[in-house]
Amino acid sequence: MTAPASLPAPLAEVVSDFAEVQGQDKLRLLLEFANELPALPSHLAESAMEPVPECQSPLFLHVDASDPNRVRLHFSAPAEAPTTRGFASILAAGLDEQPAADILAVPEDFYTELGLAALISPLRLRGMSAMLARIKRRLREAD
């Protein structure tokens, strides 16, 4: 399974990683991503970040589009929310430091390519879609 051409290379690589594993191994990979969510930079406080209420667990994001050729994404999610942290980490790994135009071109439902639908509730999967939608909205507002 190859990732759609409209995905930035780092995100396509993440999708490829998920395509290489099956069943419970996909959940293990998601948990690995959860453990790798980058810490917030010292200048960012959760209170200054945008909440994503569509997520079942508390999630906050910050989009820095001051350089549209190198958008910075920051996420905060509690350790007790590994699925949400995993989704945020996938977006951080796949989209941080990518050009705004490339992020805006990512299909809203790219997460279906991860093959998690049989393992994670649709409500939780919509949380990832909501994160991406908010990132895109911030980029459009910055344009």
UniProtKB/Swiss-Prot annotation:
UniProt entry keywords in alphabetical sequence: Acetylation
Signal peptide: none
Zinc-finger found in the keyword field: no
The organism's place on the tree of life at top rank: Bacteria
Pfam families: SufE (PF02657)
Positions of modified residues (N-acetylthreonine): T2
Protein family per UniProt: Belongs to the SufE family.
Any further remark recorded for this protein: Was identified as a high-confidence drug target.
The protein's name in its UniProt record: Uncharacterized SufE-like protein Rv3284
